[in-house]
């Protein structure tokens, strides 16, 4: 899969600046992914986000989108605004839907998914062989579906 042009990923407050594109490795079940800095329009880095392209069992639990905002920039909906831009990139890859997941105790991330009108599918137990369970001792994920 090729990396698409991402220069359109901006609005009147933020822009997503491509950090890396990972082509994926299907032999180990890794899908292609984009990693971005979330920046203001002067390109000051305020956080990071990523978009994973495609579908597999792991993405149901891990999600297609991940994000983090530096503490001094929190409270301005920058993660939600970045997600809306990533939705547009996902559409360019002909994705019809995607998942965003959050830990049940991560109230901020769950609020972002609700703010974005994601369909709450429920709280799911991670499979025993899931990397997040093995490496991070996580056991459950709130899973939200977004139809694009």
Regions picked out by a protein language model, each given a short descriptive name:
Residues 4-60:
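Acetyl-CoA-dependent GNAT
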Residues 33-35, 137-143:
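Short hydrophobic/aromatic beta-strand or adjacent loop that forms the aromatic wall/cage
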Residues 37, 50, 64, 68, ...:
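Conserved beta-strand segments that form the floor/walls of ligand-binding pockets within enzyme
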Residues 43-45, 82, 118:
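Residue-level signal for glycine
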Residues 67-69, 75-88, 111-115:
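Conserved acetyl-CoA-binding loop-helix of GNAT-fold acetyltransferases
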Residues 91-101:
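Conserved GNAT acetyl-CoA-binding A-motif
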Residues 101, 119-136:
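Conserved catalytic-core motifs of GNAT/GCN5-like acyltransferases
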Residues 105-122:
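Conserved active-site alpha-helix within GNAT-family acetyltransferase domains
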